[in-house]
A protein has these predicted regions:
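Conserved small/polar residues in nucleotide/adenosyl-binding loops
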Residues: 1-9, 264-268
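Membrane-proximal helix-loop-helix interfaces that form the catalytic/acceptor-binding platform
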Residues: 12-106, 111-266
Length: 268
């Protein structure tokens, strides 16, 4: 029993360090694939141009703003390691959530399992070196989920604030993260109602309305992008999208039609 506790202690302290070394290796390169090159090009734009392009052709500018600030903080230039490093740091932050927050909510054993299986997932190694917003979204969505469970156990104003801020950051990361946050809020509401946690209802709706209000300016942009893409897919420039085009657009969210087979097997 004592040896098991010692091993768990070593893993609890060592896994984030191992993750940093493994994932950090992926940022020591100047190679970029197409989407990463797009992110790099956005960083090179002026602030006004960056906002304009994201409003017409992309997700919200939240990730690109963070990336641009971090890139210039690291000195800028033509080397792209700083772009990848930001993803590595957010993945490390995700691991630290597993180390400290999961331990607080559950115990050290669960914390070790959380970090170990996260480290063993190949897709996490991919995203750690990916100059895209997925590592950022993973961090904030995980913080949203953990803080929600923390609130469910014992609510405080501070926890609600953390939950609300994490939710806002998540919905501004990526359109798919927005959908995931919405579904999570529905799940959280169901848990509150089923377990009859009436004292949480007020805080839940205050948080939900706050997130909705803060995101509302970009929600209009997202809806416009949604309609424009469906019109483009239908070959129409004037008519509203049909139900079939809506269903065709949503297939990316809930099917593996455009997902690599290897990743599909991984998620299953």
């Amino acid at each position: 029993a004592a040896s098991d506790v010692y091993k768990r202690q070593v893993l609890w302290h060592g896994l984030p360090v191992v993750a940093l070394f493994i994932w950090g290796a992926f940022c020591i390169t100047n190679n970029l694939w197409y989407d990463e090159a797009y992110s790099a090009s956005m960083v090179s734009l002026s602030w006004k141009r960056l906002i304009y392009i994201t409003a017409t052709d992309d997700h919200s500018p939240f990730y690109y703003v963070l990336l641009k600030l971090f890139y210039h903080l690291c000195g800028g230039g033509t080397h792209f390691w700083a772009l990848k490093l930001m993803s590595v740091l957010f993945m490390l932050g995700y691991m630290l959530l597993g180390k400290y927050y999961v331990e607080k909510l559950f115990d050290r054993k669960i914390s070790v399992y959380f970090m170990l299986f996260s480290l063993l997932m190949p897709i996490f190694s991919v995203q750690a070196g990916n100059v895209r917003m997925y590592a950022v979204a993973l961090f904030f969505l995980t913080l949203t989920g953990l803080s929600a469970y923390d609130i469910f156990r014992e609510a405080t104003h501070r926890k609600w604030i953390v939950f609300c801020i994490a939710s806002i950051c998540t919905v501004y990361c990526h359109t798919f993260a927005l959908i995931q946050t919405f579904l999570f809020y529905m799940l959280f509401l169901a848990a509150i109602l089923i377990c009859r946690k009436k004292e949480l209802v007020k805080g839940y709706f205050i948080s939900g309305f706050t997130v909705a209000i803060v995101f509302s300016p970009w929600l209009a942009v997202t809806c416009r992008q949604f309609i424009l893409r469906m019109r483009y897919d239908d070959g129409s420039v004037s008519e509203l999208a049909t139900l079939n085009s809506v269903m065709d657009y949503c297939k990316e969210w809930f099917s593996a039609v455009e997902t690599p087979v290897s990743y599909t097997h991984l998620t299953l």
